[in-house]
């Protein structure tokens, strides 16, 4: 079949990322190309624990959690890129540059996370990342992850 997508369901995501509720911020991977790019989604619901305090009468998904969701997507791309990875391997959020927040993310939104691998040097991986809602850019950043064994 031409143009078949490489996708990951929640069970596959749980097998790759160490994050768990309430910090697992990727619900599904729609498509990925190892060593190149990944497209994932995060469904934002009013049931997110953060909305009890951010903000009680005007819930807005925090920008730092948008960045974390994009970082988790980069970790998934890293794990799917490296062959023969160690069971004790993690991708740690190492840096964020040029972060820009364009629109708020609200309960009911589906964030589409797009990450693109840029380069790797000495186990530091650099990615371009974007989050979109309804096709509109809500956040963009360059993210660096450190590949480490524990």
From Swiss-Prot:
Provenance organism: Pseudoalteromonas translucida (strain TAC 125)
UniProt GO BP: fatty acid biosynthetic process; lipid A biosynthetic process
Primary residence: cytoplasm
Record has Mitochondrion as a keyword: no
Function: Involved in unsaturated fatty acids biosynthesis. Catalyzes the dehydration of short chain beta-hydroxyacyl-ACPs and long chain saturated and unsaturated beta-hydroxyacyl-ACPs.
Active site: 54
Name of protein: 3-hydroxyacyl-[acyl-carrier-protein] dehydratase FabZ
Family: Belongs to the thioester dehydratase family. FabZ subfamily.
Gene transcribed to yield this protein: fabZ
UniProt KW keywords: Cytoplasm, Lipid A biosynthesis, Lipid biosynthesis, Lipid metabolism, Lyase
One Pfam entry name: FabA
Domain of life: Bacteria
GO MF annotation: an example: (3R)-hydroxyacyl-[acyl-carrier-protein] dehydratase activity
GO CC aspect terms: cytoplasm; membrane
Record-listed E.C. numbers: 4.2.1.59
Reactions catalysed: a (3R)-hydroxyacyl-[ACP] = a (2E)-enoyl-[ACP] + H2O
Location in or out of the cell: Cytoplasm
């Amino acid at each position: 079949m031409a143009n078949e997508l490489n996708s990951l369901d929640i069970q596959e995501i749980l097998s790759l990322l160490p994050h768990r509720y309430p910090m697992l911020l990727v619900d599904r991977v729609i498509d990925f190309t190892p060593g190149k790019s990944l497209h994932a989604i995060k469904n934002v619901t009013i049931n997110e624990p953060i909305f009890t305090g951010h903000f009680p009468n005007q819930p807005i998904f925090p920008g730092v959690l948008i960045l974390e969701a994009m970082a988790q997507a980069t970790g998934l791309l890293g794990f799917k890129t490296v062959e023969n990875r160690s069971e004790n391997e993690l991708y740690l959020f190492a840096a964020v540059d040029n972060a820009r927040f364009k629109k708020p993310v609200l309960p009911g939104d589906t964030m589409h996370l797009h990450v693109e691998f840029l380069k790797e040097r000495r186990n530091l991986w650099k990615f371009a990342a974007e989050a979109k809602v309804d096709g509109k850019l809500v956040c963009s950043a360059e993210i660096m992850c450190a590949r480490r064994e524990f």
